[in-house]
Structures are given as C-alpha cells and as structure tokens.
Swiss-Prot record:
Residues that, per the record, bind heme 2: C154, C157, H158
Cofactor details (free text): Probably binds 2 heme groups via the 2 magnetochrome (MCR) motifs.
InterPro entries: MCR, Multihaem_cyt_sf
Segments crossing the lipid bilayer: 12-30
Keyword Aminoacyl-tRNA synthetase listed: no
Ranges in coiled-coil conformation: none
Organism lineage: Bacteria, Pseudomonadati, Pseudomonadota, Alphaproteobacteria, Rhodospirillales
Organism of origin: Paramagnetospirillum magneticum (strain ATCC 700264 / AMB-1)
Any one GO molecular function term: oxidoreductase activity
Cofactor: heme
Listed name of the protein: Magnetosome protein MamT
Length: 176
C-alpha cells in the first residue's frame, strides 16, 4: 500500500499538468478566434473595411461610417466666386488662401520680374494678345491642368473659379 500511494500522487500531478497545458492551448486558440481576419485594436477603419469587404476603399470613396458622420456634422455650404484680377504680393507675406502651387504661377511679386516676363511660346503670346480685348479661355479652377502651350499667367486669358463658404465664421477658406 505504501508503494501505490506515491504512484497515485504522480498520476494526479501528470493529469493536472496535461490539463493545464490543454487550458493554455485552448486559451491561445480562443484569443486567435476573437480577432477575425487579423483585425486588431490598432487596425484603422479603412483597413478593417478592406478586410471585411475584400478590398480597400479608394481615398476619396466614402467609408462605412460616412453616412453617420454626415448626419452628425452638417456640411458647409459654398458659393462660387470668380476671380478676375490677382493682386501682386510681397515675398514672405502670409497666404490668404489654401496652397495651390507656387505663388509666381498666379501672382506677380513686388520687386520681382515685370508683368509679361513669364515664359510663353509664340502661339501663347498670340493667345495672350487676343485676350486683351476679351478673355478667350473658359473659367478654370486653380488646380486645372494647362491644355495648351505656355502663355504667361492664366488670369490673362481665364477667370479663376473657387468655392467660398457662405458662412464665414471660420474664416474664408476655399474649397478646390
């Protein structure tokens, strides 16, 4: 009898160790089940949507939460504003509008090159001269691509159209 008592104790210890290892393995497996498809707490909503739907939405495409965001935050109302004249600016002054590109693409610089000194092709020079009577080009956005050879500053032939908020409480910010 004295020989069987230690064996019975070893059996319980070995069964306890096996049960403990099984519980640890089941816990690790359960942890993997609780995060489906690799979604972790650090996953962005865009990546989570891609994992769930099988593709990533485009940057300008509305997300799954966009309808809710639109309900909570009323959209800003904008009106169109046509710019027919662009004033010269001093180098180093603040920008009164969002960044569109290099200042010299639209503005003349005070103390800089004179008007008409921008590079233009002979065809562009003819277009610029014809636009002195009446602007030949259609209204364009500040971010529009140039569909013709260089012809000096865009404002000479085109009116520039921007969207300006109707409610100016937050300051005058363009929407391009």
């Amino acid at each position: 009898m004295s020989m069987e008592a230690p064996r019975r104790g070893r059996r319980w210890v070995s069964l306890g160790m096996i049960a403990l290892l099984a519980a640890i393995g089941l816990g690790l497996y359960w942890d993997q089940l609780s995060t489906p498809s690799g979604i972790t707490p650090a996953t962005s909503p865009r990546r989570a949507e891609g994992l769930l739907l099988g593709r990533l939405p485009l940057p300008m495409e509305p997300s799954l939460l966009s309808p809710l965001e639109r309900l909570l935050e009323p959209p800003l109302r904008y009106k169109l504003m046509t710019i027919r004249h662009i004033p010269p600016v001093k180098p180093g002054t603040g920008m009164p509008h969002p960044y569109v590109g290099d200042c010299i693409q639209c503005h003349l610089m005070v103390g800089g090159p004179a008007a008409g000194s921008q590079f233009k092709t002979p065809y562009g020079a003819v277009l610029e001269n014809l636009s002195r009577v009446r602007k030949l080009g259609p209204p364009i956005l500040p971010t529009s691509r140039q569909p013709h050879p260089p012809a000096g500053r865009c404002i000479k032939c085109h009116d520039i159209v921007v969207k300006v908020p109707v409610d100016k409480k937050g300051g005058m910010r363009w929407q391009l």
